C-alpha cells in the first residue's frame, strides 16, 4: 500500500522532534540513573519499577555463610509460586495453560490433544470388537 503524504510528513516531524529533544532526554535519563545523587525516587518510579535491595543483601550474606532464618522466608516464597507444569503440553496441575499463551494457541493445542486422544480410543474399541 502506498504511503500518504500526510504519514510521510508526520514521520518526518516526529524524527525532527526526537532530534531536538534527544539531548534533553539523555540528560534526564543520566540524572535519574546517577547513583551519587540528586535524582528523586519518584522520577525513577515513573520510568522503571524499583526493587528493594534488602533481599539481595540477604542473599549475599547467605552465600558467605551468615544465614539466620532466611531459609524459612525462601520456603514461604516457594510455596506461593510453586506451579507444576507439564513441559510437553504446557498444562499445569489444574489443566490451565500459562497466562502468556493466547487463546488461538490454546484452542489449537486443545484440538490437537483431543484428536490424539480420540485416535487412541478408536484403536482400543476396534481391538475389543469380536
UniProtKB/Swiss-Prot annotation:
Widely expressed, with high levels in testis and spleen and low levels in heart. In the brain, expressed in the cortex and hippocampus, and at very low levels in the cerebellum. The keyword Coiled coil applies. One of its GO terms (biological process) is dendrite extension. There is a cross-link at residue 78 (Glycyl lysine isopeptide (Lys-Gly) (interchain with G-Cter in SUMO2)). Transmembrane segments: none annotated. GO terms for cellular component: chromosome; nucleolus. Keywords: Chromosome, Coiled coil, Isopeptide bond, Nucleus, Ubl conjugation. Residues 1-23, 57-76, 104-130 are annotated as: Disordered. Signal peptide: none annotated. Residues 10-78 form a coiled coil. It is found in: Nucleus, Nucleolus; Chromosome. It comes from the Eukaryota. InterPro entries: LLPH-like. GO terms for molecular function: basal RNA polymerase II transcription machinery binding. Induction: In the hippocampal neurons, down-regulated by sustained activity induced by increased extracellular potassium concentration for a prolonged time (2 - 5 hours) (at protein level). Residues 1-21, 104-124 have a biased composition (Basic residues). Its main location: nucleus. Interacts with CTCF, MYO1C and with the transcriptional machinery, including RNA polymerase II and TBP. Belongs to the learning-associated protein family. In hippocampal neurons, regulates dendritic and spine growth and synaptic transmission. This is Protein LLP homolog.
